[in-house]
Amino acid sequence: MKRILLFTLLFASIGLSAQTKDWAQFYRYEGLNDSITARPEVVFMGNSITDCWVDSMPAFFADNNFVGRGISGQVSSQMLVRFQEDVINLHPKVVVICCGTNDIALNNGYITLEHVLQNIKSMCEIAKANGIIPVV
């Protein structure tokens, strides 16, 4: 009986551990997204290049009502998953989509170039459907 209980607890803890991982990193901009009150001119959606640009030039972003939503290491599928929360819900006029570098580097495993292009195309279609101009 103890053995069954031990295995049950072991598998339950593994399942709970897997559920706590935030693959798309929704938490990263959760509080910042809630604090945006004015419609941004542009949201920059991307990976480390975008992430570091915002950190190195904060005045440029603030002075122009630009918002940075880059996350280092992210691939196009992760960006697509968080696109609603980090772009659409902010209602920008324009979204600049900077991605594909980490897909090519296989940061999240193998992905075909066709799938990368489809992810980018999907983000563009979602943006257009919400009245946002996509720039790739």
Show the residue positions of the predicted features.
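Sec-dependent N-terminal signal peptides
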Residues: 4-13
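Short, glycine/serine-rich, charged loops/turns that create anion-binding
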Residues: 11, 49, 102-103
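Hydrophobic alpha-helical membrane-insertion segments
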Residues: 11-12, 56, 109
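Serine-esterase "nucleophile elbow" of acetyl-processing enzymes
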Residues: 17-96
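Alpha-helical cap/lid subdomain in secreted, periplasmic
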Residues: 59-65, 80-136
